[in-house]
């Protein structure tokens, strides 16, 4: 008869699993059925009140953050892989204080929503500066006293001016990536500077079969929008200049071709049965004739008959009148600008007079 080792469970024995654990795994799997996109978020260092506020905002966008034990999260994922094999990569990210996030939102929109929900928070000893922490120039909330030497010992140019403690110039107290020590954290707290950012960060999310990490989602939407607009403009210009008609450019291409044909006909002096073209050709020829006649008149007026000489004279007078009108308009605009400037100065002076009696 086989001897059973001491402490070994009997054959066929199944460890008893708490009912709440079974229920938890079942609910996690149901959420994986209900939502298209499944991911993991980092909850480390988030105060409970703020986390509750973030979860409430996300629920309004049909997005659920579900916290559970890492072991149960793994079990739920593993049991769901037959139906949703694309979720398998998430198993590698279940470590530390993470939670599931279930959503039907586009992952980029979700990332933006989570970033917008973040808030500033005081620094704690041991925190790493997310960027240069700058103490700005100007007055502080402190009365003169021992605080001046505390600020100076921390590396801040503090002085007493007009009965107030003042920082005399912008100063980088902690550089990006450096650890914030206890003394510096206390100084920042006293100065009411909250350099840390607290919020939910995406660790990884699977959407439409693709795994996205946080860095994949951190794009500048404004920059991409500008790039898209620039690309659209280049495509529009290419379509017009290469005469490749599209629904958006056909009218412009036809108008451009018409203008170019008109210019060609006018400049080449090609008479065509079109009133606009013939009018432009005749006007151009008339102008060139007057210009040539004017040049001849400067050398020898007697070379022109009276009718042509009178036409040249009228043309010159018209040109002078136009030039004079343009000069008068320019002077009027300058005078108007000067008057507006004087009115603004008078209003400013009146305001100062009212302020100081």
Swiss-Prot record:
Gene3D superfamilies in UniProt: 3.30.70.1730, 3.90.105.20, 6.10.140.760
Ribonucleoprotein as UniProt keyword: yes
GO CC terms in record: cytosolic large ribosomal subunit
A single GO BP: ribosomal large subunit assembly
Source taxon at top rank: Archaea
Keywords for this protein: Ribonucleoprotein, Ribosomal protein, RNA-binding, rRNA-binding
Extent of Acidic residues compositional bias: 325-348
SUPFAM superfamilies for this protein: Ribosomal protein L10-like
UniProt region (Disordered), positions on chain: 311-357
Keyword Ribonucleoprotein: yes
InterPro entries xref list: Ribosomal_protein_uL10 (IPR050323), Ribosomal_uL10 (IPR001790), Ribosomal_uL10-like_insert (IPR040637), Ribosomal_uL10-like_insert_sf (IPR043164), Ribosomal_uL10-like_sf (IPR043141), Ribosomal_uL10_arc (IPR022909)
Gene Ontology MF terms in the entry: large ribosomal subunit rRNA binding; structural constituent of ribosome
PANTHER family attached to this UniProt entry: 60S ACIDIC RIBOSOMAL PROTEIN P0, LARGE RIBOSOMAL SUBUNIT PROTEIN UL10
Binding partners and assembly: Part of the 50S ribosomal subunit. Forms part of the ribosomal stalk which helps the ribosome interact with GTP-bound translation factors. Forms a heptameric L10(L12)2(L12)2(L12)2 complex, where L10 forms an elongated spine to which the L12 dimers bind in a sequential fashion.
Family designation: Belongs to the universal ribosomal protein uL10 family.
Role: Forms part of the ribosomal stalk, playing a central role in the interaction of the ribosome with GTP-bound translation factors.
Name this protein carries in UniProt: Large ribosomal subunit protein uL10
């Amino acid at each position: 008869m086989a001897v059973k080792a001491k402490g070994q469970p009997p054959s066929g024995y199944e460890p008893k699993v708490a009912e709440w654990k079974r229920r938890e795994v079942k609910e996690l799997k149901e959420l994986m059925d209900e939502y298209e996109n499944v991911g993991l978020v980092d909850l480390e260092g988030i105060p409970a009140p703020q986390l509750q506020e973030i979860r409430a905002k996300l629920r309004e966008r049909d997005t659920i953050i579900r916290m559970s034990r890492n072991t149960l999260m793994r079990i739920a994922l593993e049991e769901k892989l037959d139906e949703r094999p694309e979720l398998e990569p998430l198993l590698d990210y279940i470590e530390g204080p993470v939670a599931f996030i279930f959503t039907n939102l586009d992952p980029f929109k979700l990332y933006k929503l989570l970033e917008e929900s973040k808030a500033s928070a005081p620094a704690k000893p041991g925190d790493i500066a997310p960027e240069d922490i700058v103490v700005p120039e100007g007055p502080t909330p402190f009365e003169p006293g021992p605080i001046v030497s505390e600020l100076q010992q921390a590396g801040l140019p503090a002085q007493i001016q007009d009965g107030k403690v003042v920082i005399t110039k912008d100063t980088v107290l902690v550089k990006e990536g450096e650890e914030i020590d206890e003394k510096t954290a206390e100084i920042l707290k006293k100065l009411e500077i909250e350099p840390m950012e607290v919020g939910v960060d995406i660790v990884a999310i699977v959407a439409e079969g693709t795994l996205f990490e946080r860095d994949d989602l951190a794009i500048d939407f404004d920059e991409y929008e500008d790039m898209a607009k620039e690309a659209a403009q280049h495509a529009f210009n290419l379509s017009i200049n290469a005469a490749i008609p599209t629904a958006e450019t056909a009218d412009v291409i036809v108008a451009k071709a018409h203008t170019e044909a008109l210019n060609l006909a006018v400049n080449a002096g090609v008479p065509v049965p079109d009133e606009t073209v013939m009018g432009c050709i005749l006007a151009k020829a008339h102008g060139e004739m007057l210009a040539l006649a004017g040049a001849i008149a400067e050398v020898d007026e007697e070379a022109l008959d009276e009718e042509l000489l009178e036409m040249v004279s009228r043309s010159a007078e018209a040109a002078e009148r136009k030039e004079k009108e343009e000069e008068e308009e320019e002077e009027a605009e300058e005078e108007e600008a000067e008057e507006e400037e004087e009115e603004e100065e008078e209003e400013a002076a009146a305001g100062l007079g009212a302020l100081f009696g």
